[in-house]
Protein backbone atom coordinates (compact mmCIF):
# COMPACT_ATOMS: atom_id res chain seq x y z
CA UNK A 1 0.00 0.00 0.00
CA UNK A 2 1.47 3.38 -0.97
CA UNK A 3 1.68 6.33 1.43
CA UNK A 4 -1.31 8.16 -0.12
CA UNK A 5 -3.66 5.19 0.25
CA UNK A 6 -2.32 4.50 3.76
CA UNK A 7 -2.99 8.11 4.74
CA UNK A 8 -6.50 7.92 3.28
CA UNK A 9 -7.19 4.66 5.13
CA UNK A 10 -6.33 6.19 8.50
CA UNK A 11 -8.06 9.50 7.72
CA UNK A 12 -11.25 7.49 7.13
CA UNK A 13 -10.81 6.16 10.67
CA UNK A 14 -10.39 9.72 11.96
CA UNK A 15 -13.60 10.64 10.13
CA UNK A 16 -15.40 7.85 12.02
CA UNK A 17 -14.29 9.52 15.24
CA UNK A 18 -15.51 12.91 13.96
CA UNK A 19 -18.93 11.34 13.38
CA UNK A 20 -19.05 10.40 17.07
CA UNK A 21 -18.51 14.06 17.98
CA UNK A 22 -21.19 15.05 15.46
CA UNK A 23 -23.66 12.64 17.09
CA UNK A 24 -23.05 14.44 20.41
CA UNK A 25 -23.65 17.81 18.70
CA UNK A 26 -19.96 18.61 19.15
CA UNK A 27 -17.83 20.20 16.44
CA UNK A 28 -17.01 17.09 14.37
CA UNK A 29 -13.27 16.65 14.76
CA UNK A 30 -11.74 13.19 14.94
CA UNK A 31 -8.23 11.87 15.43
CA UNK A 32 -6.35 8.57 15.36
CA UNK A 33 -2.73 7.83 16.22
CA UNK A 34 -0.92 5.07 14.37
CA UNK A 35 2.16 3.19 15.58
CA UNK A 36 3.84 0.46 13.53
CA UNK A 37 0.87 0.25 11.16
CA UNK A 38 -1.77 -0.10 13.88
CA UNK A 39 -4.18 2.40 15.39
CA UNK A 40 -3.22 2.68 19.06
CA UNK A 41 -5.47 5.58 20.05
CA UNK A 42 -8.62 7.35 18.93
CA UNK A 43 -10.19 10.60 20.02
CA UNK A 44 -12.94 13.01 19.12
CA UNK A 45 -13.98 16.48 20.21
CA UNK A 46 -15.91 16.52 23.53
CA UNK A 47 -15.54 20.12 24.74
CA UNK A 48 -19.24 20.71 25.43
CA UNK A 49 -19.90 17.18 26.69
CA UNK A 50 -16.99 17.27 29.15
CA UNK A 51 -17.34 21.02 29.87
CA UNK A 52 -13.61 21.35 29.22
CA UNK A 53 -11.63 23.52 26.80
CA UNK A 54 -9.00 20.76 26.82
CA UNK A 55 -11.28 18.01 25.45
CA UNK A 56 -10.02 18.21 21.87
CA UNK A 57 -9.70 15.12 19.67
CA UNK A 58 -5.90 15.32 19.49
CA UNK A 59 -5.43 15.75 23.25
CA UNK A 60 -7.65 12.75 23.95
CA UNK A 61 -5.80 10.57 21.42
CA UNK A 62 -2.35 11.68 22.64
CA UNK A 63 -3.26 10.81 26.25
CA UNK A 64 -4.50 7.36 25.19
CA UNK A 65 -1.46 6.69 22.97
CA UNK A 66 0.95 7.65 25.76
CA UNK A 67 -0.85 5.33 28.15
CA UNK A 68 -0.88 2.49 25.58
CA UNK A 69 2.86 2.81 24.86
CA UNK A 70 3.80 3.59 28.46
CA UNK A 71 5.73 6.69 27.39
CA UNK A 72 4.96 10.35 26.78
CA UNK A 73 7.29 10.27 23.76
CA UNK A 74 5.34 9.20 20.69
CA UNK A 75 8.39 9.39 18.42
CA UNK A 76 7.37 6.58 16.07
CA UNK A 77 3.74 7.59 15.64
CA UNK A 78 1.68 9.41 13.04
CA UNK A 79 -1.30 11.52 14.07
CA UNK A 80 -4.28 11.80 11.69
CA UNK A 81 -6.79 14.57 12.35
CA UNK A 82 -9.79 15.74 10.34
CA UNK A 83 -9.24 19.46 11.07
CA UNK A 84 -5.95 21.33 11.28
CA UNK A 85 -4.76 21.47 14.92
CA UNK A 86 -5.21 24.59 17.05
CA UNK A 87 -2.34 26.11 19.04
CA UNK A 88 -3.01 23.93 22.10
CA UNK A 89 -3.05 20.72 20.09
CA UNK A 90 0.00 21.74 18.04
CA UNK A 91 1.80 22.31 21.36
CA UNK A 92 0.77 18.85 22.59
CA UNK A 93 2.01 17.32 19.32
CA UNK A 94 5.38 19.02 19.78
CA UNK A 95 5.57 18.02 23.46
CA UNK A 96 4.77 14.39 22.65
CA UNK A 97 7.40 14.32 19.87
CA UNK A 98 5.02 13.06 17.19
CA UNK A 99 7.09 13.26 13.97
CA UNK A 100 4.30 13.25 11.39
CA UNK A 101 0.84 14.85 11.28
CA UNK A 102 -1.73 14.23 8.54
CA UNK A 103 -4.53 16.80 8.28
CA UNK A 104 -7.90 16.50 6.54
CA UNK A 105 -9.06 20.09 6.06
CA UNK A 106 -7.40 23.34 6.96
CA UNK A 107 -8.65 25.80 9.58
CA UNK A 108 -8.17 29.37 8.30
CA UNK A 109 -9.41 30.86 11.59
CA UNK A 110 -7.28 28.99 14.11
CA UNK A 111 -5.03 26.49 12.32
CA UNK A 112 -1.51 26.11 13.63
CA UNK A 113 -0.13 23.63 11.09
CA UNK A 114 0.14 26.11 8.23
CA UNK A 115 -3.06 28.17 7.91
CA UNK A 116 -2.66 30.93 10.50
CA UNK A 117 0.88 29.86 11.40
CA UNK A 118 2.85 26.63 11.60
CA UNK A 119 3.85 25.84 15.17
CA UNK A 120 4.86 22.35 14.05
CA UNK A 121 7.81 23.72 12.08
CA UNK A 122 9.32 26.34 14.39
CA UNK A 123 13.05 25.67 14.23
CA UNK A 124 13.64 27.32 17.63
CA UNK A 125 11.61 24.54 19.29
CA UNK A 126 13.26 21.26 20.29
CA UNK A 127 10.95 19.26 17.99
CA UNK A 128 9.27 19.72 14.63
CA UNK A 129 6.72 17.57 12.84
CA UNK A 130 6.29 16.90 9.15
CA UNK A 131 2.80 17.98 8.09
CA UNK A 132 0.80 16.57 5.20
CA UNK A 133 -2.41 18.43 4.49
CA UNK A 134 -5.64 18.03 2.56
CA UNK A 135 -6.01 14.24 2.83
CA UNK A 136 -9.69 13.47 2.16
CA UNK A 137 -10.16 17.23 2.38
CA UNK A 138 -13.56 17.23 0.70
CA UNK A 139 -15.08 14.68 3.11
CA UNK A 140 -13.61 16.41 6.17
CA UNK A 141 -14.66 19.86 4.98
CA UNK A 142 -18.18 18.73 4.04
CA UNK A 143 -18.79 17.33 7.50
CA UNK A 144 -17.72 20.62 9.11
CA UNK A 145 -19.87 22.68 6.73
CA UNK A 146 -22.92 20.48 7.28
CA UNK A 147 -22.49 20.64 11.06
CA UNK A 148 -22.32 24.44 11.12
CA UNK A 149 -25.18 24.78 8.63
CA UNK A 150 -27.37 22.65 10.92
CA UNK A 151 -26.20 24.54 14.01
CA UNK A 152 -27.10 27.90 12.46
CA UNK A 153 -30.53 26.55 11.43
CA UNK A 154 -31.18 25.32 15.00
CA UNK A 155 -30.12 28.68 16.43
CA UNK A 156 -32.37 30.49 13.96
CA UNK A 157 -35.35 28.29 14.91
CA UNK A 158 -34.65 28.84 18.61
CA UNK A 159 -34.48 32.60 18.11
CA UNK A 160 -37.69 32.53 16.06
CA UNK A 161 -39.56 30.62 18.77
CA UNK A 162 -38.38 33.08 21.44
CA UNK A 163 -39.79 36.03 19.51
CA UNK A 164 -43.05 34.34 18.51
CA UNK A 165 -44.23 33.96 22.11
Please report, for each region that a protein language model flagged, where it lies by residue.
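Zinc-dependent deaminase
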Residues: 1-24, 88-165
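Short, basic and Ser/Thr-rich N-terminal targeting/leader segments
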Residues: 25-29, 75
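Short beta-strand scaffold segments in enzyme catalytic cores
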Residues: 29-37
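Active-site phosphate/pyrophosphate-handling residues
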Residues: 9, 38, 60
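Helix-adjacent hinge/juxtasegments
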Residues: 54-55, 59, 63-96, 100
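A short acidic/small-residue loop/turn micro-motif
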Residues: 47-49
Amino acid sequence: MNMQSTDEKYMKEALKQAKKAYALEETPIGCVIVHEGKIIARGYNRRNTDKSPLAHAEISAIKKASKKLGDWRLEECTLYVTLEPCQMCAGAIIQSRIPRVVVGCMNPKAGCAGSVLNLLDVQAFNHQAEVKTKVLEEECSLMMKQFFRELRAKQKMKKKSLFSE
